From Swiss-Prot:
Gene3D superfamilies: Anticodon-binding domain, Bira Bifunctional Protein, Domain 2. GO terms for cellular component: cytoplasm. The keyword NADP does not apply. The keyword Ligase applies. The gene is hisS. It comes from Synechococcus sp. (strain CC9902). One of its GO terms (molecular function) is ATP binding. It is found in: Cytoplasm. InterPro entries: aa-tRNA-synth_II, aa-tRNA-synth_II/BPL/LPL, Anticodon-bd, Anticodon-bd_dom_sf, His-tRNA-ligase, HisRS-like_core, HisRS/HisZ, HisRS_anticodon. Belongs to the class-II aminoacyl-tRNA synthetase family. The lineage of its organism: Bacteria, Bacillati, Cyanobacteriota, Cyanophyceae, Synechococcales. CDD domains: HisRS-like_core, HisRS_anticodon. Its EC number is 6.1.1.21. Homodimer. It comes from the Bacteria. This is Histidine--tRNA ligase.
Length: 430
């Protein structure tokens, strides 16, 4: 019989990897709480129209990458490819915006049919924040600073913030006209994908990875030249705010992001921790999305980071600096003790002892194999515990437990089997 495998691009997360994963999530949760963001959880499956209206039908995400199907009620459903549209839908459905601005964060799986590669899978995971009802340019600065500080606290090095302004809807309309006119005169020099985008989503041509197209764009009109005075002033406030916080940035005039709902501030944070600059976080302002989805015109700003890519970066940082923040975060936490036991009475006593120590807050690995003491000691060494607690029927009869150090060659010693205070003091001693 053929062995069943996970689908391509759908990766199992095993216990050791999840310890690192949860450590990163815990740090993120702390940062979000300190900044006043509350967690929201939305379904992984949504009506397809949510993403067609929200993301834009001309985008690659909607046109090429979504997992879409009809359910048994013949409703078109889609596994969510990103989190923002779902958060906005939930906020509208539950009337959250009537209560004033909402600061929300989320974490969970997303789905896109892309070519799997390191740090990018077809089921991938994002952590993101959405500040609904935030009109001020200072809010843009605050959410960018939140992302920057989170990544820095994870020990991620080589960070670079790329920044651009996409302007207002009118600004982009004027720029689109100028860009299309310029590109149409040179359409024979464009790569195939860029020619296809010329009449559907021309701004995405700026993000082309084709080297010849990038070289051609060096002479193209820039979006900055199409910004109205109000948009320029707003962008200047963002830059000044970041400078006042000591957050360095680089203006990137071709940064447009991949989703249609962005306006004004757009940004990406990259890291060279993997050898080349890799994007670990991206976002920006989206003042029109809530209105597009049936709500009142409401300004908003947010970002998302990809957990798979971030974990690669964090682990690279840990390898580069074994004593740094990343190494401490990604270290697999071993149990406080491994409970070795053999014999009918010892097995009963070991179960009671393990439960008592766990209830007191310790991590105890209880061996239930019934194997020989030598085999159990080998397992104890492999698990990384500092101590082995040894119980045989003889120890139980004497009312004691043998403590065997595993991290050095010091002598074994005994403590009372029911001396929980003494055991706790010893097992938690540095």
């Amino acid at each position: 019989m053929t062995q069943l495998q996970s689908l391509r691009g759908m990766v199992d997360l095993l216990p050791q990897a999840l310890q690192r994963w949860q450590a990163v999530e815990s740090v993120a949760r702390t940062h979000f709480q300190r900044s006043g963001f509350g967690e929201i959880r939305t379904p992984v499956m949504e009506p397809t129209d949510l993403f067609c209206r929200g993301i834009g039908e001309a985008t690659d995400v909607v046109g090429k990458e979504m997992y879409t199907f009809n359910d048994r009620g013949d409703r078109s459903c889609t596994l969510r490819p990103e989190g923002t549209a779902s958060v906005v839908r939930a906020a509208l459905q539950h009337g959250l915006l009537s209560q004033g601005p909402q600061k929300l964060w989320y974490a969970g799986p997303m789905f896109r049919y892309e070519r799997p590669q390191a740090g990018r899978q077809r089921q991938f995971h994002q952590i993101g924040v959405e500040w609904l009802g935030a009109a001020s340019a200072r809010a843009d600065v605050e959410v960018i600073a939140l992302a920057w500080d989170l990544l820095a606290s994870l020990g991620v090095g080589g960070l670079e913030l790329e920044l651009n302004s996409l302007g207002s809807t009118d600004d982009r309309c004027a720029y689109r006209t100028a860009l299309v006119a310029w590109l149409e005169q040179r359409s024979n020099l464009l790569d195939e994908d860029s020619r296809a985008r010329l009449n559907t989503n021309p701004l995405r041509i700026l993000d082309s990875k084709n080297k010849a197209t990038q070289a051609l764009l060096d002479g193209a009109p820039t979006l900055a030249n199409s910004l109205a005075p109000e948009s320029r002033e707003r962008f200047e406030v963002v830059q000044q705010g970041l400078a006042s916080l000591g957050i360095p940035f680089r203006l990137s005039p071709r940064l447009v992001r991949g989703l249609d709902y962005y306006c004004h501030t757009a940004f990406e944070i990259t890291s060279d921790q993997l050898g080349a600059q890799a994007t670990v976080c991206g976002g920006g302002r989206y003042n029109g999305l809530i209105g597009q989805l049936g709500g009142p015109d409401t300004p908003a700003v947010g970002w998302a980071l990809g957990m798979e890519r971030l974990l690669l970066v964090v682990e690279a940082a840990a390898n580069a600096d074994p004593d740094g923040d990343s190494a401490r975060l990604t270290a697999v936490v071993p149990p406080n003790a491994y409970l070795v036991n053999r014999g009918e009475q010892a097995e009963k006593a070991a179960l009671i002892l393990a439960r008592s120590l766990r209830c007191a807050g310790l991590v105890i690995e209880l061996d239930n194999s019934g194997a020989s003491f030598s085999k159990q000691f080998k397992r104890a060494d492999r698990c990384g515990a500092r101590w082995a607690l040894v119980l045989g029927d003889e120890e139980v009869e004497k009312g004691e437990v043998r403590i065997k150090p595993l991290s050095d060659e010091s002598d074994d010693f005994f403590l009372g089997l029911h001396d929980l205070t003494g055991l706790l003091a010893k097992l938690t001693a540095m």
